[in-house]
């Protein structure tokens, strides 16, 4: 069937800002699909508000609208752009919900826009809980006893009838938002009230709990002729009851019998046929571990998080092929880009095991509820490939970049009591895997662990094998025991920890078992493949990877977490483009399955590996690159630079010694003094007693900052001795013994610059001004370009300071500098690498900053790039505002008040001719607030309204606000803005606003600006 020639232009809806439940996988899918549609000859119109993505680059689509993903905004764009068709299934739940809203508003019909791919009727049937239940009954597919409810009374009645526990699943939500398991009437009432509020159609499914069953996923592809294939089967390590995004997942399925597998496979294909899916589709099923009974859990009629994992696990480009199907092609007509000889109708085959482990942000939110359930809490994930399940699991653990002690020991970092074991194993948190390994090392019977956790004994037996390998080393670290452990993926660090010796000693003792590299080819070696996609294993003798020659190796940034997000994948991809344009082969090492950088077509060769010295050095030894670039991999790559240099590896760009100088707080303070650059009065300490003395000498309030951390980890403002003790303890743990800077807190305007330098001169594309004052992490502050309140003299001084620092450090490539402006211009931080603002500044200046920085790293000068040293003049009549996006609604009891510790998961961009228009556009997708006219007023709490600064602000703006003491005091059916500066976990305003899906403001400067640019709100 030829492609659809009746249409010429296609609008694609992106997924918007990164948040828990909807992350970088949609940048990967959307980029892949847009490029495929362009290659097919269509005019592609992209609508997305996320500046941090490759998807919103001008090269990805013919027209890019960086605009809010609201019905009003998208309707306006569709009227102006006149697309023939709309493809919404690449934008996650956001894209689907917008497509439904556009249809219900009559926009698609009015503008005669054809919907591509899966129909709206199908989307509705899959997403609407009642409609889906009806379909399953018609297909004779078993589903748990359930009912659809719109109020609490009917839910309680149903639960009483079928018995507790029950599962609450809100309709049309993301990542299980608002859902949960209820064990009694009180829990059901609480969970349901939240779920009904968060569902855009005020609907929830109340379902008999099948927690404890095996959870199985199939990624299915179906074309326009009805040809269907299973792209990938996946099995969750954790049983039903834990969101699949928070579960460890293996591919292919590991524990089903052939009969069980075929039964579930048939069910998945039956459902996709009945729904008339056109493209990619994910189905989740539950298998009773004690019988052949299974149940259908749910389906996703779109590209999903699991699609990205399945694509990377198999090498099969799901989003690209889904886009091809959407324009009329069939699987038998689409070539598999991996083999370039077979067609997409062939089901992929795997001769390896893939493990995905989620990455959580509870290190950022120690007060948040870390228990896992049906609502997703992970911010990102890692993937690893191995010859055995043990090897894949241990490689994935090595990729997580968690606490080094836990990563080395594979156990909690403290003595665990029997009571704690039982609690952690029966009420799982993000640490359950490590408690399991500790329990197995301690000799707990496998059967008891299976009973406590409901995890399939097969998986526990694999963990038991790992524990035995470790016990052997602990008892007698012979070469045989070490080699056996290495073969199954036990890291050198873990072996050294238990053998009580150095990593170097272990490396020497295991040198006779080198890693070899195997290809990911989609066909288990059955056909010849050309994919440059490899993984390491200690099993096997044949190396399938051969040196490219004339290459540069680029370190990726690993899993997405707060402080190190998709922005660094953006810079990595652009670095690769510049390397290739310079005539080198580009090699990427990374382990994040969600990203564009780990698409094998991005680089000349991809190694899907942990970002550790143990895994990097054999790759470097094989490839012999001309150098390694670390500037675009965030703190992950920077932290590896020192060790790489010690091992004789050429690290390109700014020297490692200069990097260490800026990362070490004491050395950097000395540098600023030498250059006569203003800095806050302060000193460095390494322990609590010295901190108390320093605090009394400097005076409160103080800013406490550890060295070598990302995202403001363990940074805090301290006002007295009582607050100092826990903050210093946290900073010592986060910095692993490195100096902690304690300096005077400066209350002023914070701003920052990204700098391009060739070592002698520097170019500054723009100065960014923060709305929130110093003391709020730059990643959480609303950022404005060009600055609105900095005088020309201040801007000149910023340029002078940046130039001084770049020259002194001999910075080559990119650098980010943060300032506070009060009576003087003070430097507060320097990062000699790409920062999270690079995509934002690249979009608003129309300069490929990461590519330019890479060219400088490869030896070019600013002059040869045509860049004039100094500050770039901003474009006239354009204001660009970057606003943070938070996922507090997914992390109950987390602190919400903005502070030096970063909390946001993503960002959105608003652009306009004036500050006001740009502000409204940015707020629409970040705080879901366009103007005060759309709300009924302001709600705050007693602790917040008691603060003098708040009282002064309210009086100056003649505000009448509603003050609440309990969450139930929030006015029903009210569109209001919550405002709080109270960081207690039981804060009623934060809880109520998040439960009601209402805007929540947690910094006084944000509210000040909102009041300054919009009319005063009404009174509730």
From Swiss-Prot:
Residues engaged in binding Mn(2+) 3: 818
GO biological process, one term: L-arginine biosynthetic process
Binding site for Mg(2+) 3: 818
One Gene Ontology CC term in the entry: cytoplasm
Region (Carbamoyl phosphate synthetic domain): 543-927, 544-927
Region of interest (Carboxyphosphate synthetic domain), residue spans: 1-401
Domain notes: The large subunit is composed of 2 ATP-grasp domains that are involved in binding the 2 ATP molecules needed for carbamoyl phosphate synthesis. The N-terminal ATP-grasp domain (referred to as the carboxyphosphate synthetic component) catalyzes the ATP-dependent phosphorylation of hydrogencarbonate to carboxyphosphate and the subsequent nucleophilic attack by ammonia to form a carbamate intermediate.
Protein name stated in the entry: Carbamoyl phosphate synthase arginine-specific large chain
Source species: Lactiplantibacillus plantarum (strain ATCC BAA-793 / NCIMB 8826 / WCFS1) (Lactobacillus plantarum)
The organism's taxonomic lineage, starting at the top: Bacteria, Bacillati, Bacillota, Bacilli, Lactobacillales
């Amino acid at each position: 069937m030829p492609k659809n020639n009746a249409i010429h232009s296609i609008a694609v809806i992106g997924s918007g800002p990164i948040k828990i439940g909807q992350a970088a996988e949609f940048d990967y899918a959307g980029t892949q699909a847009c490029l495929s549609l362009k290659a097919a000859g269509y005019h592609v119109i992209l609508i997305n508000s996320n500046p941090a993505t490759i998807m919103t680059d001008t090269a990805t689509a013919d027209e890019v609208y960086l605009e809010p993903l609201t019905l009003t905004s998208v309707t306006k764009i569709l009227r102006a752009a006149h697309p023939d068709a709309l493809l919404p299934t690449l934008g996650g739940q956001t894209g689907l919900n917008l497509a439904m809203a556009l249809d219900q508003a009559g926009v698609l019909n009015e503008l005669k826009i054809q919907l591509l791919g899966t129909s709206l009727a199908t989307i509705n049937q899959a997403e609407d809980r009642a409609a889906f239940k009806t379909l399953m009954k018609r297909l004779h597919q078993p589903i748990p006893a359930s009912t659809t409810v719109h109020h609490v009374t009917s839910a309680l009645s149903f639960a009483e009838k079928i018995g507790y526990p029950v599962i609450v699943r809100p309709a049309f939500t993301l990542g299980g938002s608002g859902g949960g398991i209820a064990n009694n009437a009180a829990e059901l009432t609480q969970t349901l009230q939240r779920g009904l509020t968060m569902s855009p159609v005020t609907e929830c499914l109340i379902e008999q709990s099948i927690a404890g069953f095996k959870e199985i996923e199939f990624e299915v592809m179906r074309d326009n002729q009805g040809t269907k294939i299973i792209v990938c089967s996946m099995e969750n390590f954790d049983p039903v009851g834990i969101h699949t995004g928070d579960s460890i997942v293996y591919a292919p399925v590991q524990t089903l019998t052939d009969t069980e597998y075929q039964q579930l496979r048939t069910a998945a294909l039956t459902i996709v046929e009945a729904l008339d899916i056109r493209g990619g589709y994910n189905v989740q099923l539950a298998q009773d571990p004690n019988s052949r009974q299974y149940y259908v859990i749910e389906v996703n009629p779109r590209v999903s998080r699991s699609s990205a994992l399945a694509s990377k696990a198999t090498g099969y480009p799901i989003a690209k092929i889904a886009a091809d199907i959407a324009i009329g092609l069939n699987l038998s007509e689409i070539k598999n880009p991996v083999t370039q000889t077979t067609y997409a109708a062939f089901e992929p085959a795997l001769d390896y095991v893939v493990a995905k482990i989620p990455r959580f942000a509870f290190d950022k939110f120690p007060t948040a509820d870390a228990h896992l359930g049906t609502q997703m809490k992970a911010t990102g994930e890692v993937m690893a490939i191995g010859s055995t399940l043990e090897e894949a699991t241990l490689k994935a653990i090595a990729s997580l970049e968690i606490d080094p002690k836990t990563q080395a020991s594979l156990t909690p970092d403290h003595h665990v009591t029997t009571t704690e074991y039982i609690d952690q194993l029966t009420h799982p948190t993000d640490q359950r895997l490590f408690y399991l390994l500790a329990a197995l090392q301690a000799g707990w019977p496998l059967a008891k662990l299976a009973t406590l956790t409901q995890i399939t004994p097969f998986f526990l037996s694999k963990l038991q094998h790992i524990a035995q390998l470790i016990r052997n080393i602990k008892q007698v670290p012979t070469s045989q025991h070490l080699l056996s452990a290495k073969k199954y993926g036990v890291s050198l660090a873990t072996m050294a920890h238990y053998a009580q010796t150095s990593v170097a000693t272990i490396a020497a003792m295991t040198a006779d078992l080198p890693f070899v590299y195997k290809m990911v080819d989609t066909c288990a070696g059955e056909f010849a493949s050309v994919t440059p996609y490899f993984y390491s294993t200690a099993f096997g003798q044949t190396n399938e990877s051969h040196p490219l020659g004339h290459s540069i190796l680029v370190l990726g940034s690993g899993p997405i977490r707060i402080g190190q997000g998709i922005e660094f994948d953006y810079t990595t991809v652009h670095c690769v483009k510049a390397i290739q344009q310079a005539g080198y082969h580009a090699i990427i090492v990374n382990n994040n399955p969600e990203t564009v950088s780990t698409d094998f077509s991005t680089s000349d060769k991809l190694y899907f590996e942990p970002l550790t010295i143990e895994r990097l050095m054999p790759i470097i030894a094989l490839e012999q690159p001309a150098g390694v670039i670390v500037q675009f991999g965030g703190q992950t790559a920077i932290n590896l630079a020192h060790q790489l240099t010690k091992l004789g590896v050429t690290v390109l760009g700014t020297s490692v010694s200069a990097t260490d100088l800026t990362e070490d707080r004491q050395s950097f303070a000395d540098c600023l003094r030498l250059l006569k650059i203003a800095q806050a009065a302060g000193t460095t300490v390494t322990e609590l007693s010295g901190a108390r003395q320093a605090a009394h000498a400097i005076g409160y309030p103080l800013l406490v900052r550890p060295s070598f951390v990302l995202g403001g980890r363990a940074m805090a403002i301290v006002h007295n001795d009582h607050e100092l003790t826990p903050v210093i303890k946290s900073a010592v743990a986060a910095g692993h013994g490195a100096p902690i800077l304690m300096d005077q807190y400066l209350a002023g305007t914070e701003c920052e610059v990204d700098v391009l330098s060739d070592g002698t001169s520097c170019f500054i594309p723009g100065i960014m001004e923060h709305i929130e004052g110093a003391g709020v992490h730059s990643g959480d502050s609303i950022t404005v370009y060009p600055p609105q309140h900095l005088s020309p003299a201040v801007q000149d001084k910023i340029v002078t300071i940046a130039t001084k620092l770049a020259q002194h450090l001999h910075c080559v490539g990119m650098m980010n500098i943060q300032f506070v402006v009060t009576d003087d211009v003070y430097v507060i931080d320097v990062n000699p690498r790409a920062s999270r603002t690079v995509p934002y500044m690249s979009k608003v200046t129309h300069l490929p900053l990461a590519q330019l920085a890479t060219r400088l790293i490869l030896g070019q000068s600013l002059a040869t790039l045509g860049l004039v040293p100094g500050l770039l003049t901003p474009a006239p009549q354009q204001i660009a505002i970057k606003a943070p996006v938070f996922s507090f609604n997914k992390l109950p009891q987390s602190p919400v008040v903005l502070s030096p510790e970063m909390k946001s998961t993503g960002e959105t961009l608003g652009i306009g001719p004036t500050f006001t228009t740009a502000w409204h556009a940015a707020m629409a997708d970040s705080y879901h607030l366009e103007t005060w006219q759309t709300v009924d007023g302001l709600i705050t709490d007693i602790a917040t309204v008691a603060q003098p600064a708040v009282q002064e602000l309210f009086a100056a703006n003649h505000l009448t606000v509603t003050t609440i003491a309990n969450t139930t005091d929030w006015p029903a059916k009210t569109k209001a803005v919550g405002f709080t500066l109270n960081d207690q976990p039981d804060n009623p305003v934060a809880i109520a606003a998040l439960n009601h899906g209402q805007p929540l403001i947690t910094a006084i400067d944000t509210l000040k600006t909102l009041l300054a640019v919009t009319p005063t709100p009404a009174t509730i």
